[in-house]
């Protein structure tokens, strides 16, 4: 295969922009639900779901995050790259076994 015999590239034809307001007006249909008032719907959450919805329940240890941020800023954060690599390799090996 010769490099000199390649076909010349043709210019791409430009795409004409559409008017988004015209498209939105054409596709928008009046909804019957928007005209009628919505009847009351009652939702009952389980205790576990209610606990998760409370603002005090966090799955992030904020104190640990702040400690790590300060260690990074001060340059005192040490990482065991060998341990990270071993865990990564173990994870990949487990994934390959399960595939």
Curated annotation (Swiss-Prot):
Compositionally biased spans, kind Polar residues: 22-39
Residues covered by region (Disordered): 1-42
Domain of life: Bacteria
Magnesium is among the record's keywords: no
GO biological process, one term: bacterial-type flagellum organization
Keywords annotated in UniProt: Bacterial flagellum biogenesis, Repressor, Transcription, Transcription regulation
Pfam families per the UniProt record, alphabetical: FlgM
Keyword Transcription: yes
Protein task: Responsible for the coupling of flagellin expression to flagellar assembly by preventing expression of the flagellin genes when a component of the middle class of proteins is defective. It negatively regulates flagellar genes by inhibiting the activity of FliA by directly binding to FliA.
Similarity comment text for this entry: Belongs to the FlgM family.
Protein name (record): Negative regulator of flagellin synthesis
Organism, scientific name: Yersinia enterocolitica serotype O:8 / biotype 1B (strain NCTC 13174 / 8081)
Lineage, broadest ranks: Bacteria, Pseudomonadati, Pseudomonadota, Gammaproteobacteria, Enterobacterales
Gene designation: flgM
